[in-house]
């Protein structure tokens, strides 16, 4: 089991690093635009990219393009796994990354924000 909170995936160690506890429900509701199918889901994946991590390799805008592609691939894989395990997934791209980042203890301007994917049991 895993405690509620914000976690950052560490690719070198293939582990989750705890960042912070979840913010109050009201702030989360505001951050996702009061979309009930997202607010009430038990699991949320937020796909982000950090240009600083790969800028040494791609010294141009290729690093940004590469991050967008990776964010897209990751979002697709999360949704495919949810479907394969008979769960419902819903992705949104309009959310308040500033609220989420602030509560997670991150500088929201340092990342490329992709999608927020809510995953939960099917309603049927």
Specify the residue positions occupied by each region the protein language model found.
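Acidic, surface-exposed loops and disordered segments
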Residues: 1-124
């Amino acid at each position: 089991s895993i405690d509620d909170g914000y976690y950052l995936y560490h690719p070198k160690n293939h582990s989750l690093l705890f960042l912070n506890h979840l913010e109050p429900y009201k702030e989360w509701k505001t951050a996702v635009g009061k979309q009930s199918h997202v607010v009430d889901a038990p699991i949320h994946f937020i796909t982000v990219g950090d240009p600083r991590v790969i800028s040494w390799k791609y010294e141009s805008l290729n690093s940004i393009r590469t991050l967008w592609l990776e964010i897209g691939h990751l979002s697709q894989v999360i949704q495919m796994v949810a479907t394969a395990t008979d769960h419902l997934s819903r992705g949104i791209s309009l959310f308040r990354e500033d609220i989420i980042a602030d509560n997670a203890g991150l500088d929201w301007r340092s990342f490329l924000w992709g999608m927020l994917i809510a995953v939960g049991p099917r309603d049927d």
